[in-house]
């Protein structure tokens, strides 16, 4: 059996986020001043977390957010980040660089709901979901392979699994679940993975967790909250568990969703 922690963070605010202009993949906008502050606040919030892996979309806003997080880490400042195009935002085709209101008008003209509508040259929701599944399955196989190698190397030696207190893998606030449910105590973690990505992409990935993998949710979290767009630098934590072995789909437990405690008191730049 192997399990790992997965922390997913949306990038910080850009000028186009604030102005409600669609970026997608074709508009590589940097963080705004507020966005850099958000990334720094996220880094301070996560500075005690011992991440073992870091993955980011290869777009500028996610790269800058990842840098803002890791440069404030007590343990991960020198960690190598793997930039992966599978973590990019949904491609919006002809409406990239245009106002969100234009996308809504096009969807209305096509008599479709905005999230479902695919503008010319854009990705369908299914295409975005398949990218997310492809990355997630790659990540799971990577962690399982590394866990097997560690087990072979350390046979006869004390376990080298990560510390499994949730306080060690995520600084949960008072209003969130404080432990992982387990029938056999608190099993070790093979890894703690940080991913920085984008709002529409994350919503699609979380839908896969909920719909296909039957992700369990905290009692205080509703399905609508799970499917809402994550705010800039909002954080979500999942425990991915291969208790039935690698040939069976993992179980997914959501510990918290769209957490933004780190933004309390942050002054927005005008």
UniProtKB/Swiss-Prot annotation:
GO terms for molecular function: fructose-2,6-bisphosphate 2-phosphatase activity. It is an enzyme of class 3 (hydrolase). One of its GO terms (cellular component) is cytosol. InterPro entries: His_Pase_superF_clade-1 (IPR013078), His_PPase_superfam (IPR029033), PG/BPGM_mutase_AS (IPR001345), Phosphoglycerate_Mutase (IPR051695). It catalyses: beta-D-fructose 2,6-bisphosphate + H2O = beta-D-fructose 6-phosphate + phosphate. The modification N6-acetyllysine is found at residue 50. Induction: Up-regulated by p53/TP53 (at protein level). Rapidly up-regulated by p53/TP53. Up-regulated in glioma cell line in a p53/TP53-independent manner. Pfam families: His_Phos_1. PROSITE patterns: PG_MUTASE. Its main location: cytoplasm. It comes from the Eukaryota. The keyword tRNA-binding does not apply. Keywords: Acetylation, Apoptosis, Autophagy, Cytoplasm, Hydrolase, Mitochondrion, Nucleus. The active site is at residues 11, 89. Its EC number is 3.1.3.46. Belongs to the phosphoglycerate mutase family. Interacts with HK2; the interaction increases hexokinase HK2 activity in a hypoxia- and HIF1A-dependent manner, resulting in the regulation of mitochondrial membrane potential, thus increasing NADPH production and decreasing intracellular ROS levels. This is Fructose-2,6-bisphosphatase TIGAR. It comes from Homo sapiens.
């Amino acid at each position: 059996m192997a399990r790992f922690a997965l922390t997913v963070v949306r990038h910080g605010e850009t000028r186009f986020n604030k102005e409600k202009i669609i970026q997608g993949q074709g508009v590589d906008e940097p963080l705004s001043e507020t966005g850099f502050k958000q990334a720094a606040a996220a880094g301070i919030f996560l500075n005690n977390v011992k991440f073992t892996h870091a993955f980011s979309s290869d777009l500028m806003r996610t790269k800058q957010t990842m840098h803002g997080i890791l440069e404030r880490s007590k343990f991960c400042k020198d960690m190598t980040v793997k930039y992966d195009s599978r973590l990019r935002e949904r491609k919006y085709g002809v409406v990239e660089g245009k106002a969100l209101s234009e996308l809504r008008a096009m969807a209305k003209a096509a008599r479709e709901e905005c999230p479902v509508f695919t503008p010319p040259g854009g990705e369908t929701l299914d295409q975005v979901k398949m990218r997310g599944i492809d990355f997630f399955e790659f990540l799971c196989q990577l962690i399982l392979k590394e866990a097997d190698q560690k087990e072979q190397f350390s046979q006869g030696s004390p376990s080298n699994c990560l510390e499994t207190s949730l306080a060690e893998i995520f600084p949960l606030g008072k209003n969130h679940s404080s432990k992982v449910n387990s029938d056999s105590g608190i099993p070790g973690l093979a890894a703690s993975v940080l991913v920085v990505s984008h709002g529409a992409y994350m919503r699609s990935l979380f839908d896969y967790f909920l719909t296909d993998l039957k992700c369990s949710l905290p009692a205080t979290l509703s399905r609508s909250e799970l499917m809402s767009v994550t705010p800039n630098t909002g954080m979500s934590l999942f425990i991915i568990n291969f208790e039935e072995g690698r040939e069976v789909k993992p179980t997914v437990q959501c510990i918290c969703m769209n957490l933004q405690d780190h933004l309390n008191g942050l002054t927005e730049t005008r």
